[in-house]
Every structure is written in C-alpha cells, then in structure tokens.
A protein has these predicted regions:
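A short, aliphatic-rich beta-strand micro-motif
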Residues: 119-128, 135
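Regulatory cytosolic signal-relay segments
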Residues: 163-197
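Amphipathic alpha-helical "output/dimerization" segments
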Residues: 129-132, 146-170
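Short beta-strand-to-loop transition segments that serve as allosteric relay/switch motifs
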Residues: 71, 136-145, 166
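Regulatory sensory and allosteric helical modules in signal-transduction proteins
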Residues: 56, 64-66, 73-109, 117-122
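Helix-loop-beta substructure at the N-terminus of cytosolic sensory domains
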Residues: 19, 25-66, 74, 82, ...
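Flexible loop/coil segments at beta-strand boundaries within sensory signal-transduction domains
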Residues: 41, 57-60, 127-133, 142
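Signal-transmission linkers at sensory-effector interfaces
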Residues: 1-33
Length: 197
C-alpha cells in the first residue's frame, strides 16, 4: 500500500509540473525562459544532475542547444544522427543509457571540456501537434537510481507545453513580420505617391 501511495503522489507531482509548464505557455513568448523552466522542472522532478534542450533548426536540420545546464562555453550544435541527441532526433525514439561511455554514439568531449562525468542519460524527442520533431530534451545522471520508462513518459508530457509555446512564438513572429512588411509597403506607396507630379 505504501509503494502505491508513493507512486500516486509522484504521478500527481509530475502532473502538477506539466500543468505549471502549461500555464507558463500563456504567460510568455520568451522561448529561452520557457526552455529554462521546462529543463529545470525536468531535472528537479526526475532527480537528474543536469539537463539540456536542443532545438531543431528548420533551415539546416541540425540541433542547437537552447539550454545546457552546467555548460558555459556557449551553444552546442549537433547534426542529425550525430551522438545520442542526434540519434534520438533521427530515430524519433526516446533512449535511456545506463553507461553512455559504452555506447559508440556517445561523444565525451563535453565531459572533457567541463570536467563533468556523465554516468547515465535520458534523451527524449519533443514533437509538435502534427508530429514534427521540434526539439530533443536530455537529462544527465539520475541522482538516486536509474532513469525509467515513467521518466520517459513524463518528459514526453512535459515537452507538450514547450511545443505549444514554440508554435505560438513562431506564429507570433510570423504575424509581426507580416505586419512590418505591410507597413513598409504602405510607406513605400505613400512615398511613391508623394514623389509623383
């Protein structure tokens, strides 16, 4: 009974976090702030040491880190299919690695640069409503055990508000760009009329 109660409490805690992230979607168009918040929630509730979120660049197809906790060297860029993040992006399937150094796809250069020791990884694709890959969320080093299927499920749910926010921000940016273009066209037409005899 005690284990069931503990599991139920954990599920409630995680659902509350998804709701919290969902509420934040309505309060900001700042994707960097939202990404930080989502990664922070994920690392806290899954009890991971660090987390990162890689956004898919729609022009190049590569992935660029929006959040990389503990990394001060600037954004990382990963090609589709490269490393664990790129492999998850290419396959669209979440992965749990209990010993990343034993996996030939793991790239230890970030560990070497930062002095951090990656012992385990949980990497999950984030999709929009149409099922298009928009980001990859990765957690490093579970503090109190191993990453689980329940953790994968939670990260997938937590990615939904971020996907909605990204879509909303893209639409907002598109509307602002169109409106700016309309103003410029109107201004050009007014200037042209003013210059005509």
């Amino acid at each position: 009974m005690s284990d069931e109660l503990t599991e139920a409490r954990e599920r409630v805690r995680r659902l509350e976090a998804v709701v919290e992230a969902g509420l934040m979607v309505n309060s900001t168009l700042d994707l960097a702030e939202l990404a930080e918040h989502v990664v922070s929630i994920a690392t806290r509730l899954i009890d991971a040491e660090r987390g990162s979120l890689f956004l898919v660049d729609r022009k190049t197809g590569s992935l660029r880190s929006m959040v990389a906790q503990g990394l001060s060297t600037g954004p990382l860029t990963v090609e589709m299919g490269e490393g664990i993040v790129g492999a998850v992006a290419a396959s669209g399937e979440a992965e749990i690695l209990d010993d990343p150094y034993a996996d030939s796809r793991f790239e230890p250069k970030v560990d070497h640069i930062t002095g951090f020791q990656t012992r385990s990884l949980l990497t999950v694709p984030v999709r929009d409503r149409e099922g298009m890959l928009i980001a990859v969320l990765q957690l490093l080093n579970h503090r109190s055990g191993r990453f689980s299927a329940a953790d994968v499920e939670f990260l997938a749910e937590l990615g939904i508000p971020f996907a909605i926010a990204l879509t909303t921000a893209d639409l907002h940016r598109e509307i602002v760009t169109r409106e700016q273009l309309r103003r410029e066209v109107r201004l050009a037409a007014e200037i042209q009329r003013a210059l005509q005899p």
